[in-house]
Amino acid sequence: TDIGGGLDVGGGLRGGLDIDAKGPDVDIKGPKVGGDISGPDLDVSGPDLDIDGGGKKGKGGFGFGLKMPKFGFGGHGKGDIDVDADVDIERPDLDVSGDADLPSGGVGLDVGGGIGGGLGGGLDIDANGPDVDIKGPKVGGDISGPDLDVSGPDLDIDVDGKKKGKGGFGFGMKMPKFGFGGHGKGDIDVDADVDIERPDLDVSGDADLPSGGVGLDVGGGIGGGLGGGLDIDANGPDVDIKGPKVGGDISGPDLDVSGPDLDIDVDGKKKGKGGFGFGLKIPKFMDPTFGFGGHGKGDIDVDADGGVVIPEGDIKVKTGKPDIGGDVDLPSGGVDLDVGGGIGGGLGGGLDIDAKGPDVDIKGPRVGGDISGPDLDVSGPDLDIDGDGKKKGKGGFGFGLKMPKFGFGGHGKGDIDVDADVDIERPDLNVSG
């Protein structure tokens, strides 16, 4: 009798002749890679301003001018926070082979490589391939950009102007261009390169059973398993392979940059035709070194008028490729069964043959992690302004507040770019049994 068919994922062989040939149990676990790769905690806050100005009376005027200096951390220099972690773990090239040879007898079974196969008939043959449990590495980690807290200055301004006459009261405050801008280049670069490959492993086991009523030849692979009335049990070795555990914490520095606290109390008294004038001008608040603008290179990348760029996290994880194949050969006898490879198909007939492929548990590596941009807290200045103008006459009271260009905008390039490149390849696995 000649039976040929496609291979089924599953299936089994059953019959009155009981032959049980089991390949090796193979349990392969890749390394666990855990880590915390985080950029710096960045806290940048502008100055706290508390200004109290009072001006009184007469034809004259009161003038107050406050001009903040260029308050910066920089220059044209180059500064960067660079966290570079290179982890290289090599996986095994795994070669597991087990031979179970039963010489010729009444039944001949030839199972080509595949993932199973299902045939039914009156003769009960149970062929089980090896149990293969392959687990890739667990890669867990927390890759996060910096915690960025950027806040403008706290402003508390109390202005009281009382006046008689033709003059007027005027208040003007002009905030600066307070932004993270400029033409410079800045970045926080967290580059984590994880390359995981398994070690070379060669496990072989031979089980030879002399001639009898059934001929069984089990080549390597993920296929095969025979059972019948004649009890033959050939077990390959149990193989348990665990890769190394790699854990780490890679974190950038905590960076806290804060401007000065400014408390200004101004009282101006004057007589004359003029009026009362108050002017607050804060300069351009830049920091090229730390990325707050300017033309320099500053490598905490808050780029181009407030562009906030998360560190480009580049994470690469590589593992090897499995190569699993096998042949189960039973020499010729009363029945000749040839099952070709494939992932489908099942044949049924009066002859009960149940061919089971191996229990194959292949788990790729678990790549877990938290890849998140920074906790970004950007707040404009807190403004507490109390202006009281009382007046008699033709004059007027004027109050002007002009907020700056405060934002993450402009023509520059600002993005949150988290680039995680995970390249996972299975180990070179050669299992034959």
From Swiss-Prot:
A molecular function (GO) term: RNA binding
Cleaved signal peptide residues: none
Region (Disordered): 366-389, 411-433
Placement of sequence motif Nuclear localization signal: 266-274
Its membrane topology: Peripheral membrane protein
UniProt-listed PANTHER family: LEUCINE RICH REPEAT FAMILY PROTEIN, PERIAXIN/AHNAK
InterPro entries (alphabetical): Myelin_sheath_structural
Species the sequence originates in: Strongylocentrotus purpuratus (Purple sea urchin)
GO cellular component: endoplasmic reticulum membrane; nucleus
The Sequence repeat ranges on this chain: 112-122, 219-229, 340-350
Encoding gene, per UniProt annotation: VAP-1
Residue span of region 3 X 11 AA repeats of G-G-G-I-G-G-G-L-G-G-G: 112-350
Name this polypeptide is given: Vesicle-associated protein
Tissue: Egg cortex.
Purpose: May function as a multidomain RNA-binding protein. May play a role in nuclear RNA processing and in early development.
Basic and acidic residues bias locations: 423-433
Lineage of source species: Eukaryota, Metazoa, Echinodermata, Eleutherozoa, Echinozoa
Subcellular location per the Swiss-Prot or TrEMBL entry: Microsome membrane; Nucleus; Endoplasmic reticulum membrane
